């Protein structure tokens, strides 16, 4: 079995913001197109695994919608991704409906042949540190059973509450002081 050091060998996490992608597209179209092919392929895999008709994540929609994409690579090959962005949502706390600008996890995918190695947790924790946010302050866009299990395993105890808009929040979401949406 791999040790943690061996698992993380040759791995890199890269953050791509809208500005980064627009700059890459204008300055190095070849590199942009290569990244686009990899991200679009992984977005297709993510959507297929969730039985969705459309693709949640393409490089174009990351740039167009002002989201942030975290890419996990091994020896330059994309093996995982996490997309996060800000959405204006109506959230129900059990009594009242609140309209807020919320930090949202929009897509999260690790290639099948790289799962069960702790790499998803590494990627998720990298994003949390980068955005200076706790998992309970995120809204999760229609999370799959696998993502719900991941959250319960790594951030237990956590009770997840489904919202009418198909987002899911932690039960303590409203118990914490409201923070400003993260900086992009």
From Swiss-Prot:
Site entry (Crucial for catalytic activity), positions: 50
GO molecular function, one term: tubulin N-acetyltransferase activity
Transmembrane segments: none
Protein name: Alpha-tubulin N-acetyltransferase
Gene Ontology biological-process entries: regulation of microtubule cytoskeleton organization
Organism ancestry: Eukaryota, Sar, Alveolata, Apicomplexa, Aconoidasida
Origin superkingdom: Eukaryota
Binding site for acetyl-CoA: 108-121, 144-153
Key word Iron-sulfur present: no
InterPro entries: Acyl_CoA_acyltransferase, Atat, GNAT_ATAT
Species name: Plasmodium vivax (strain Salvador I)
EC id: 2.3.1.108
Catalytic reaction(s) noted: L-lysyl-[alpha-tubulin] + acetyl-CoA = N(6)-acetyl-L-lysyl-[alpha-tubulin] + CoA + H(+)
Pfam families named among the record's database cross-references: Acetyltransf_16
GO CC field: microtubule
Residues annotated as signal peptide: none
Annotated ranges, domain N-acetyltransferase: 1-174
Family: Belongs to the acetyltransferase ATAT1 family.
Function: Specifically acetylates 'Lys-40' in alpha-tubulin on the lumenal side of microtubules. Promotes microtubule destabilization and accelerates microtubule dynamics; this activity may be independent of acetylation activity. Acetylates alpha-tubulin with a slow enzymatic rate, due to a catalytic site that is not optimized for acetyl transfer. Enters the microtubule through each end and diffuses quickly throughout the lumen of microtubules.
